């Protein structure tokens, strides 16, 4: 018998961070019932007696606080699990919200999560051609090799730091602090700034890129260019025009797909990285690491850890 809601969640196979988050959501619901049950005057205030009416009142309360439907749906799912635990404990006879669902909630687009090993393999198997390559004597080979070296450095930051493609393009020389083992990621309209730790395995490769590869790439760019990742000229041109960086993602995506059929795109990589973070760190830490402006954005990734998040509900309350 699971004597506490926490042990009940653990028995369901939830990760440590999910258990902590879900337990706090349940406590928030209980606190609401204790403090604000006057909105339901016929309610005694005891959570064992809570019905769909009280749950709907709580969801209205969250809506007034500005929570999005997706976030409130996660909260609703937690209350469902809490009621199921109460049934197991003999504290209630049935689950009054078993088929309750918030209308208008769009299904979170879930990417198949790549394991840590699969993410590492994407990086490790991305090959940089050597001077013994059969095309090494072609006039385009030098820039081709440089682009591969640049791309491998980019993959390192996407797989370990979970950067978005626009964030990669915005990184400047001053943002990469190799001596301190840190990377500064500037904020934007959609994301917060943050400083992330570099892993020890990244330092030497990033140093090689910054002080060797980038210096060679600079020959094809403006000498005062401050971006960390530089473009190579398109075929037939002697210099980069400054827009080529915006065109690397489709080609790089196709390259990786050829070797890794499970790979879909770089949003999948970021989703996988954040999902793995949530198994290791708490919500607020992951919110900072991911650059999310609101914790509700981070909460959405909890869906990737919850296999039973209302996939099979056929009936719903017209909320």
Give the location of each predicted region.
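Conserved catalytic core of the tyrosine transesterase superfamily
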Residues: 1-319
């Amino acid at each position: 018998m699971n004597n506490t809601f926490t042990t009940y969640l653990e028995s369901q196979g939830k990760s440590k961070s999910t258990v902590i988050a879900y337990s706090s959501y349940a406590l928030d619901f209980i606190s609401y019932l204790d403090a604000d049950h006057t909105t339901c005057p016929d309610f005694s205030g005891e959570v064992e007696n809570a019905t769909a009416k009280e749950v709907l009142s709580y969801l209205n309360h969250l809506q007034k606080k500005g929570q999005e439907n997706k976030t409130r749906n996660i909260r609703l799912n937690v209350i469902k699990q809490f009621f199921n635990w109460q049934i197991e404990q003999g504290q209630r006879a049935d689950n009054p919200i078993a088929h309750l669902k918030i209308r208008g909630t769009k299904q979170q687009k879930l990417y198949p999560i790549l394991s840590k090993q699969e993410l590492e393999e994407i990086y490790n198997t991305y090959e940089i051609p050597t001077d013994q390559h059969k095309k090494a004597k072609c006039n385009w080979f030098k820039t081709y090799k440089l682009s591969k070296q640049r791309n491998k450095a980019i993959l390192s930051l996407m797989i370990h730091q979970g950067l978005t493609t626009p964030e990669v393009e915005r990184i400047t020389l001053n943002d990469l602090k190799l001596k301190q083992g840190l990377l500064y990621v500037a904020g934007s309209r959609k994301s917060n700034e943050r400083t992330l730790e570099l892993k020890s395995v990244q330092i030497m490769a990033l140093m090689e890129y910054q002080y060797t590869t980038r210096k060679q790439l600079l020959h094809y760019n403006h000498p005062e260019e401050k971006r960390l990742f530089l473009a190579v000229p398109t075929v037939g041109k002697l210099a980069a025009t400054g827009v080529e960086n915006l065109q690397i993602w489709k080609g790089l995506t196709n390259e990786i797909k050829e070797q890794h059929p499970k790979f879909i795109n770089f949003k999948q990589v970021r989703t996988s990285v954040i999902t793995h973070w949530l198994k290791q760190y708490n919500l607020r830490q992951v919110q900072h690491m991911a650059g999310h402006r609101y914790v509700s954005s981070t909460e959405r990734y909890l869906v990737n850890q919850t296999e039973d998040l209302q996939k099979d509900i056929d009936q719903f309350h017209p909320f």
